């Protein structure tokens, strides 16, 4: 009879209010139902989880609070964003997407239904969910909330198992079940090995018992990804301090947070961790697909855009080099994604028609040798593209200032990580990436005035000596010839490009996630092994949807948070 009575019990879920008090909702039922509705008090210790998105993953508005970059979900894509930006040229992009003319937009879409710990739209907004991409992140954040806050009895966390434990079948058995200490647990979907066949440290029941003593409200932190990540780091510090403060009310106690980052958000979090007293307020950090030392594809996009890399993304980010440069050059945050000195030398190559490299850069300093190379055609920025039609031109000096900020930022975080850091990154050849950018050359259709210059002269050419429209079509010498021909009764125009040499940027050449090469993703353990608790290489993972679409990435994040929860100060 005891179990039958327990099985009939009814429970109402408590949701925290903005003042960290709790409230429950219950609909009136038939008077024949006399069983009491029970409310279980959640733990009074709080360790908030703060999600920090990647570049372009935060919603932005202009200074009148009109959205200019809004990642709301329409049939699993940011359809309105794609439509709006696909119609904007380089000038419009330059006008709208400037760090001093934009700010974080806080009123993006939020979930319509309750989550495990959030009871209404206002609370989602207050916790920052409206600041970040609904398309890329909300599905994951809802999943994480359910995992961390859906059940407080560790004996009922079905992702963790041990053969010595029986499985409760009835509600009564579940309510009475307790997890014993001293067990080594198996975790669902967790890989057996991290990287280089290194073993994964198991979760113990003691860690689960420690985790069960706290709540883990899920917050999101949007930032202006056009501005320097140094500024974003300072804003993150302010948000963390605010979150800790608001979770210290009455008998509720909070002293630390856990950070989970995506892509460039990892650079923001690392910089924040270096600010005074912040490492003590952060239990640890989980980094996903972070360009730890930069990504060479950032250079490639400045030169030829994204059309041949990803047509759909190119409509938004920029189909050609002119559209990308218009925003990139005036945005310190974007420039901070370029390969740093720690990325290493020799990632930019120019090859002759036989495949032999005739130029390899940088030798040491990518900032002076490539990013501020003003004359050479292979320099990061074509100065003419700083002044697009209908835009608001920036001068070379402003670009130089932004590159200097990137250099200083890179050096400030180089090799520096929180003492409790977990990492996962894309590896293997399934997706591929660009560890190097390679310019291939071949003989063009000879012009009338062909001078017969050898390929070895190509690296010495200036911007003015190269013809390009910002796509992956560059020409040395020659001209564009347009002629009219008849096809049946119709006249059509035929375009022919003559040149001494044609130059094309090669495709993917290394393991990675499509954006970040494995050599950058794995850099944390190589440069700071004592700070890295576990580092996972995942084959087949894609960069933008890493948290949304990869069950293994989700499991690793859940594992890392569980490990970090056991290290939290719950006094």
Task: Label each region the model flagged.
Residues 1-260, 264-322, 345-353, 450-452, ...:
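N-terminal non-catalytic accessory region
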Residues 284-287, 291-397:
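Extended catalytic-interface subdomain
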Residues 384-571:
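C-terminal subdomain of alpha/beta-hydrolase-fold enzymes, centered on the catalytic histidine
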Residues 52-55, 340, 426-427:
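Structured loops at beta-to-helix junctions and adjacent beta-edge loops in soluble globular domains
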């Amino acid at each position: 009879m005891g179990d039958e009575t327990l099985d009939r019990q009814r429970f109402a879920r408590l949701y925290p209010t903005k003042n960290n008090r709790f409230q429950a909702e219950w609909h009136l039922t038939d008077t024949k139902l006399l069983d009491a509705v029970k409310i279980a008090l959640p733990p009074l210790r709080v360790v908030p989880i703060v999600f920090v998105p990647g570049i372009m993953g935060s919603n932005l508005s202009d200074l009148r609070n009109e959205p200019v970059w809004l990642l709301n979900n329409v049939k699993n894509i940011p359809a309105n964003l794609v439509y709006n930006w696909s119609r904007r040229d380089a000038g419009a992009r330059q006008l709208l997407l400037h760090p001093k003319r934009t700010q974080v937009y806080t009123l993006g879409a939020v979930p319509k239904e309750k989550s495990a710990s959030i009871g209404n739209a206002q609370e989602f907004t207050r916790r920052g969910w409206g600041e970040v991409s609904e398309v890329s992140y909300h599905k994951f954040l809802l999943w994480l909330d359910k995992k961390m806050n859906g059940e407080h009895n560790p004996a009922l966390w079905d992702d963790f198992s041990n053969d010595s434990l029986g499985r409760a079948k009835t509600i009564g058995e579940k309510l009475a079940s307790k997890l014993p200490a001293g067990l080594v647990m198996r975790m669902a979907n967790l890989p057996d090995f991290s990287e280089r066949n290194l073993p994964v440290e198991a979760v113990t029941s003691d860690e689960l018992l420690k985790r069960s003593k706290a709540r883990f409200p899920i917050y999101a932190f949007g930032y202006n990804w056009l501005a320097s990540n140094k500024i974003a780091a300072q804003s993150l510090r302010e948000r963390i301090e605010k979150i800790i403060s608001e979770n210290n009310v009455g008998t509720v106690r909070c002293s630390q947070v856990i950070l989970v980052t995506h892509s460039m958000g990892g650079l923001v979090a690392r910089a924040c961790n270096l600010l005074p007293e912040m490492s003590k307020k952060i239990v640890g950090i989980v980094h996903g697909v972070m360009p730890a030392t930069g990504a060479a594809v950032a250079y490639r996009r400045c030169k030829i855009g994204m059309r041949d890399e990803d047509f759909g993304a190119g409509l938004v980010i920029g189909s050609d080099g002119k559209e990308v440069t218009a925003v990139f050059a005036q945005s310190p945050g974007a420039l901070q994604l370029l390969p740093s000195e720690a990325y290493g030398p020799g990632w930019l190559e120019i090859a002759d028609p036989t495949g032999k490299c005739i130029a390899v850069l940088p030798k040491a300093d990518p900032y002076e040798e490539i990013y501020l190379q003003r004359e050479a055609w292979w320099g990061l920025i074509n100065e003419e593209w700083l002044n697009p039609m209908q835009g608001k031109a920036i001068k070379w000096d402003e670009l130089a200032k932004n590159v200097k900020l990137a250099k200083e930022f890179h050096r400030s975080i180089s090799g520096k990580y929180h003492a409790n850091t977990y990492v996962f990154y894309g590896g293997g050849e399934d997706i591929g990436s660009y560890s190097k950018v390679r310019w291939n050359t071949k003989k063009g259709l000879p012009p009338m005035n062909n001078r017969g210059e050898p390929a070895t002269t190509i690296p010495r050419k200036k911007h003015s000596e190269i013809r390009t429209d910002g796509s992956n079509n560059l020409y040395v010498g020659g001209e564009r010839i347009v002629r009219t021909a008849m096809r049946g009764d119709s006249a059509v125009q035929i375009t022919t490009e003559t040149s001494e040499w044609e130059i094309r940027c090669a495709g993917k050449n290394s393991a990675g996630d499509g954006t970040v090469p494995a050599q950058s993703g794995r850099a944390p353990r190589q440069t700071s092994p004592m700070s890295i608790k576990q580092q996972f290489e995942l084959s087949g993972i894609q960069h933008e949807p890493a948290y949304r679409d990869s069950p293994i990435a989700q499991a690793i994040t859940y594992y890392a948070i569980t490990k970090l929860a056991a290290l939290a100060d719950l006094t």
